[in-house]
Amino acid sequence: MPRTEMVRFVRLPVVLLAMAACLASVALGSLHVEESLEMRFAAFKKKYGKVYKDAKEEAFRFRAFEENMEQAKIQAAANPYATFGVTPFSDMTREEFRARYRNGASYFAAAQKRLRKTVNVTTGRAPAAVDWREKGAVTPVKVQGQCGSCWAFSTIGNIEGQWQVAGNPLVSLSEQMLVSCDTIDSGCNGGLMDNAFNWIVNSNGGNVFTEASYPYVSGNGEQPQCQMNGHEIGAAITDHVDLPQDEDAIAAYLAENGPLAIAVDAESFMDYNGGILTSCTSKQLDHGVLLVGYNDNSNPPYWIIKNSWSNMWGEDGYIRIEKGTNQCLMNQAVSSAVVGGPTPPPPPPPPPSATFTQDFCEGKGCTKGCSHATFPTGECVQTTGVGSVIATCGASNLTQIIYPLSRSCSGPSVPITVPLDKCIPILIGSVEYHCSTNPPTKAARLVPHQ
């Protein structure tokens, strides 16, 4: 064989071997990436205690995890000052996450259409950095769970801070009070911070119960019936204010007055691990959070936000977003409760056994043809019509939440307040109410106040 032919014959296997080695390297690299993703999924399941009912569901959750890791890469590319990756929500589809944790869009959209009368704020004197956590005005991060109650956590977080800034001890207050009892909002199906402030002032005398006496139990998505009695009052508010849609004004008000309730577009929050968001999705408000501080000394400057997704998400439950560029639409719906000066908490409400008596009379002066019946407070009482009532005794008034279409205190309701120990004319006679500790009258029905 000629020498040149022999050289060609020798070179050919060498080339083939090199190509085979290259292909093997690519295959091994691909396998390594796949194994890495599977290892991350296994670590995710272990960290968050994830257990799936069968192999089909596990495969579905793995695909969701894979998609979320790809989304995390996209977010990281758009936000060079932040990191994204595995979070407690990494096995959820984007649609599931939106429905469970970002379900307030309709409430916030309606609120944006209303005419807001904002408070006047003097700008230009705010310090370069504020963090109300360092001043003892922020309770530990809480967990809303599988309930669309972010609005309640935002409202209560604001009141906790305002109460402390007014000179009172910091106390953890009850989100469950709002989720179960606020008749303006929709519990786990969404709500609005301004609505919650209004309900507290107009229907609950401005009082807010403590977390210890009325703990949060709606993390599983269930919404227990309202129970107004037997709870300790931990704080009280007199009003609320809306702030201008201006970040300088928001910073000035926060620096002087404490944490603020705000709404944001939380689409970019799902895969967030830490750092400062500078390219936050800003399409529509859908989530309520608490603004607790800012830092203008940083580059970029940032806001500090407390979330209600546990301390296993984000920066121990917090997120930072760039200040001055309306990231996540953060300046669109900012509000705060108003608290008076430092005062001791109001006295506790009557004990669970408290009752009230209705004197129903045929005449208009509460003197002729009268009958008397005693009913429990804080419990569902059926009326002589088709409705039902939950009543609460106050110092001088009786508050009734009337459910005109339900015999089980559910559905649409109307709150009213009537004076105690005073004759009140109604369409079919007159009534008078008295708070007492007498035992309830058996099988009695309340004559509805008309």
From Swiss-Prot:
GO cellular component: lysosome
KW Methyltransferase (keyword) present: no
Disulfide bonds: C147-C188
SUPFAM superfamilies listed in its UniProt record: Cysteine proteinases
Effect of S186F: In strain: Rhodesiense WRATAT 1.1
Sequence segments annotated as region (108-residue extension): 343-450
Molecular-function GO terms, alphabetical: cysteine-type endopeptidase activity
Glycosylation sites: N120, N397
PROSITE patterns xref list: THIOL_PROTEASE_ASN, THIOL_PROTEASE_CYS, THIOL_PROTEASE_HIS
Gene3D superfamilies: 1.10.287.2250, Cysteine proteinases
Domain of life: Eukaryota
Removed propeptide positions: 21-125
GO process terms (BP): proteolysis
Alphabetical list of InterPro entries matching this protein: DUF3586, Papain-like_cys_pep_sf, Pept_asp_AS, Pept_cys_AS, Pept_his_AS, Peptidase_C1A, Peptidase_C1A_C, Peptidase_C1A_papain-like
One of the Pfam families matching this protein, by short name: DUF3586
Note: The 108-residue extension appears likely to be processed in part to produce the mature enzyme, and may be involved in targeting the protein within the cell.
Biological role: The cysteine proteinases have a potential role in host-parasite interaction and virulence.
This protein's name: Cysteine proteinase
Organism: Trypanosoma brucei brucei
